[in-house]
Regions:
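Glycine- and charge-rich intrinsically disordered segments
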Residues: 1-59, 64, 255-292
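Binding-interface segments
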Residues: 35-252
Length: 292
């Protein structure tokens, strides 16, 4: 009898024990929590864009990206837009494109973290777009296995520099850290790619070539301050890495990686195309793109 009561007691405890929630329920609750966090974090100026910030949660879910990471990216985006209120107007006018820009951050594995400076939200032709920096492109190429290493360097007056081509090509650069490093003393730059096979490729660009691309930049053409004024050497390096990207192997890439690469190169390629046809919008003076 006592044994029967003990069994009944155990059975009752099992019935009362909480059943684990299904994964779908847990995921739904996590998404709801992320939505609440996004809504609560929106400043007054960005509340009309609430749904734009929420929609990319679906992309995060499909890619297996934690909601916490996307909420963090939303916070970075909000900071950028409050700092540059022109972006807010562009996002309100073209909300779908703004959603695409946020999605592109996730699809490429980039971050809008301002301390890392790998990707930004920029206006181009009145539309908010994601753009990668020199460091962003460098990190992507290495992290995705497009190459083992990729780097760009600038050469200044007073430094030893020589290249040799033929059957055994090589490049020699002895920097002078105490030389004058200014736009006036810049001679040019070069990139070096180390492929997965160990093979090395390199090429150079003169200052004149870099300056020719700078002059075609829409931000420079506006006559107002541009990244070429505030971050000249960074822009020179981005010009070089855009050229280097043409030499990266694309065969064997997964469809997802190909899509991400298209996104990363997309804005730079569009601006280069528009530069050639004179179709730049002069109102968008914050774009820091260079020709590929």
């Amino acid at each position: 009898m006592a044994k029967e009561q003990e069994l009944n007691l155990q059975g009752g405890c099992q019935q009362q024990a909480a059943q684990p929630q299904a994964p779908a329920v847990v995921a739904s609750q996590a998404t709801e929590q992320a939505v609440i966090q996004i809504k609560n974090g929106l400043p007054e100026q960005l509340r009309p864009l609430q749904q734009c910030f929420i929609k990319p949660l679906e992309t995060a879910k499909k890619m297996g990206i934690p909601n916490e990471r996307y909420v963090q990216e939303c916070n970075f985006a909000m900071q950028a837009m409050l700092k540059n209120t022109y972006l807010i107007g562009c996002a309100k006018k073209y909300p779908d494109e703004f959603v695409s820009a946020l999605n592109n951050v996730l699809l490429t594995g980039m971050t809008l973290n301002p301390t890392l400076n790998v990707a930004y939200l920029v206006p181009y032709k009145g539309v908010v777009q994601m753009q990668t920096s020199y460091m962003g492109k460098k990190s992507y190429a290495i992290n995705t296995g497009l190459c083992k290493d990729i780097d760009c360097s600038l050469v200044f007056k007073g430094e030893e520099f020589a290249i040799s081509k033929g059957t055994n090509p090589s490049i020699k650069h002895i920097p002078n850290p105490w030389a004058s490093h200014t736009a006036d003393t810049l001679l040019g730059g070069y990139y070096v790619i180390t492929y997965s096979s160990g093979k090395i490729a390199f090429d150079t660009m003169s200052k004149e070539e870099i300056e020719a691309i700078k002059k075609r930049s829409p931000s420079v053409g506006s006559g107002k301050q541009s990244p070429w004024d505030t971050d000249y050497f960074e822009m020179c390096k981005k010009t070089l890495i855009n050229r280097a990207y043409k030499q990266l192997p694309k065969i064997g890439m997964s469809p997802e990686a190909q899509k991400a690469l298209e996104i990363i190169n997309g804005l730079d390629e569009q601006v280069a195309k528009d530069n050639n046809y004179g179709q730049n919008e002069q109102d968008d003076v914050f774009v820091d793109v260079t020709e590929v």
